[in-house]
Amino acid sequence: MKRLLYLLAILLAPIHVSAQMLFSENMTMSIDSTKTLQGTISPSLNFQTEKENVFTFRNSANINLLIKRSRVINLINKFEFSTYGKKVTLSGGYIHAEFRYLLDHAFEVYPFAESQWAASRGMAFKFSTGLQSRYRLVNSSTTLMFATLGLFYEYEEWERPMPAPNGPKYAYSHRIKSHLSLSMRNKIGEHWELTTTAIHQATPDTYLKKARFGGAVDLKYNITPSIGIRGAYRLIYDTDPIVDIRKDYNVVDAGLDISF
């Protein structure tokens, strides 16, 4: 009971975002059918000496609730807060939820919803919801591969980098988009795991001209079955951003994974 309350506290906390894509495919590759409640948490702590001492704590959570072996509720989030002297600052974040239906041993469909706010690069708020399907292409002792296809609604609110003196401060976007992705996880020896994902998103009428592409690479070293060290790289390339920003966005991160 204490563990469940702790996990709920993580999920309900304010959360941090890094980009337009959450790459949830990299975090939902496999489910242990012997566990009802399972997942990972990834805490990190940063300290800097500026005019005041600055502590920054980040934590991400990926929680799966298995229902009768054929349904999964998946919740993913991330939050961050900092202390600057005696002042505590809560940053933006995201939350992603999906309800996965296993229709066949290799095929599943799932409605999903996600929200992001106070993101980097000026994205003030984003909400998306839709329906996706996923088919398992490869399932061996060392390799797992999925192809995902879906359709979703996306609302975005961006702060303009240099608004006109009397012009609007924010730009808005309402779009229906398609989602296509390919994800693969490889076990390398006894301790290493490599997970990669490639994503294409676009509106039906601008499938190639104004697409958004994404790539993710996670490399994990499992110290024990429950504790690992993860390094991650994320790339987003938006061919037609709604405000004047760089088209490419890159993130490199590292942290500790604690599984249960």
Residue ranges and their predicted role:
Residues 222, 248-260:
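Outer-membrane beta-barrel "beta-signal"
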Residues 45-47, 65, 101, 135-137, ...:
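Residue-level signature of outer-membrane beta-barrel architecture
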Residues 43, 59-61, 95-97, 131, ...:
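Membrane-embedded beta-strands of outer-membrane beta-barrel proteins
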Residues 41-47, 75-81, 111-115, 131, ...:
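Transmembrane beta-barrel strands of outer-membrane/channel proteins
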Residues 144-226:
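Outer-membrane beta-barrel transmembrane domain signature
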Residues 1-35:
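Cleavable N-terminal export/targeting peptides
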Residues 37, 68-75, 106-109, 141-145, ...:
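Repeated loop/turn-to-beta-strand initiation elements of outer-membrane beta-barrel proteins
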Residues 35-37, 53-57, 89-93, 123-129, ...:
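Residues that define the transmembrane beta-barrel architecture of outer-membrane proteins
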